[in-house]
């Protein structure tokens, strides 16, 4: 009789554990996207979520450090909660980051995506969210990256150097600008008639908008599986 009760206890324990695992797998990883400008990469993430490319996570918050950023309109159209955090109003980098942390914690955010976020985050911040912050950079790191390399300047440098191939990289963020572990890269060939502007648009379309959603899904899926 005791053996029967023992088997029953084991059976119930297995059922409970499986139920916990199913609930964990069903729960989406909560994503925050930090922006500063037009939000084209944010839109790529929203589109990917709508198409089911990003299925392990959900964009739950958009934070901008620029009050007039069009990315905020994109968030509004997609019914995603948003907030504006202005460093000049808070007075210091520390206060600026504390406010961002407050918003992230309030929304129970799991991972952070920097999508054209034009502000360097401190070592304290990046360590707090170690392996939880993703950034997309418009070159094949380690080329044309680090301090001073952002936006159109990256593509100007690639053309000035005369390289034949460029691309984009998604990487984890640490205290070194563009120095974190690489998650995914995609190459784009440079044309003879390219200008910085045409190259920027093609790198966005052929690389950034492809590998950023794919990387976000990869990280979310891995986080859910833990």
Task: Identify the function of each model-found stretch.
Residues 3-226:
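One-carbon transfer enzymes
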């Amino acid at each position: 009789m005791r053996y029967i009760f023992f088997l029953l206890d084991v059976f119930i324990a297995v059922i409970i554990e499986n139920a916990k695992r199913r609930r964990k797998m069903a729960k989406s990883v909560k994503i925050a996207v930090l922006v500063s400008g037009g939000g084209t990469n944010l839109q790529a993430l929203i589109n990917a979520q709508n198409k089911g490319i990003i299925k392990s996570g959900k964009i739950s918050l958009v934070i901008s450090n620029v009050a007039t950023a069009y990315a905020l309109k994109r968030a509004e159209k997609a019914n995603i909660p948003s907030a504006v955090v202005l460093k000049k109003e808070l007075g210091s980098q520390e206060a600026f980051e504390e406010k961002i942390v407050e918003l992230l914690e309030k929304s129970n955010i799991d991972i952070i995506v920097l999508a054209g976020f034009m502000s360097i985050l401190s070592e304290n911040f990046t360590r707090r969210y170690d392996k939880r912050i993703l950034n997309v950079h418009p070159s094949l790191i380690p080329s044309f990256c680090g301090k001073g390399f952002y936006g159109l300047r990256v593509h100007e440098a690639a053309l000035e150097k005369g390289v034949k191939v460029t691309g984009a990289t998604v990487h984890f963020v640490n205290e070194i600008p563009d120095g974190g572990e690489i998650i995914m890269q995609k190459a784009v060939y440079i044309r003879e008639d390219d200008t910085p502007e045409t190259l920027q648009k093609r790198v966005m379309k052929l690389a950034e908008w492809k590998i950023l959603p794919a990387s976000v899904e990869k990280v979310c899926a891995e986080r859910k599986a833990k």
